[in-house]
Amino acid sequence: MKHPVRRLAALLLGLTLWTVPAAAVETQPASEDLTALMEDFRAEYGLNEGNFSLCYYNTVTGEEYRYNDTKFMIAASTYKLPLNMYYYEMEAAGEISSATMIGATTLADAHYQSLVWSNNDVSIDMLYNLGNFRTYKNTMKQYFTMPDEEIDSIYYADNYYCTSMMLDTLKHLYEGGDKFDEMIDYMKQAQPGEYFKLYVTDYEIAHKYGYYVDDGVTAINDTGIIYTPQPFLLAVYTSDAPG
């Protein structure tokens, strides 16, 4: 059985291609078709609130589906999504230069290494260039709609995020205009034929994936923009999920 992260983009692609666009783009509740599709998918893979979290958003119809989206889980390398986005915004505002040294390399190269190759050492240098770990986590919160009182303390202590936060980040990225063109291009280059890209070959995908194995825990995650005729945003976290 293939891991669920690798099948989800293709599964939702099929639904998106035959959905008739709505006139408005405000957030809409999930259709009965989408809800049933996701229920069947979870049952097939043995997915539950202990091992699976998902957020889906259709940028054309506004349809949104969430499952277990506020559960904080090991983010693996998906933390690099809001981290890089923040630096691109600082560059656009003239607050930092792409030639600024981040550790042993320039910020321009750090973006490439972090987003295309998911270089951990470079990304950690980017993180601590902002200050200590708490400062970095507080800085990232500007992209999230989750109220402070709902954010679990583990968020501040370790590399934990939730898919609700990742969906907020993807929305900001998708709607952010020219300042994110390079970032999206790098995300399109990353990991061809893997994660969301395994079964979706006819449409571009800009994604930031994450893979973590340690202490008996395996996290396989992906977050991205799938550029179908109705582009959709997808964030999926797993923890020891079957497949």
Predicted segment positions?
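Active-site helix/loop module of the DD-peptidase/beta-lactamase fold
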Residues: E95-W117, K137-E149
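Aromatic- and histidine-enriched alpha-helix N-cap/loop-to-helix transition segments
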Residues: A76-P82, W117, D158-S164
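Bacterial N-terminal signal peptides that target proteins for export
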Residues: M1-A9
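Bacterial N-terminal signal peptides
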Residues: L11-T19
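Sec-dependent signal peptide cleavage junction
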Residues: W18-P29
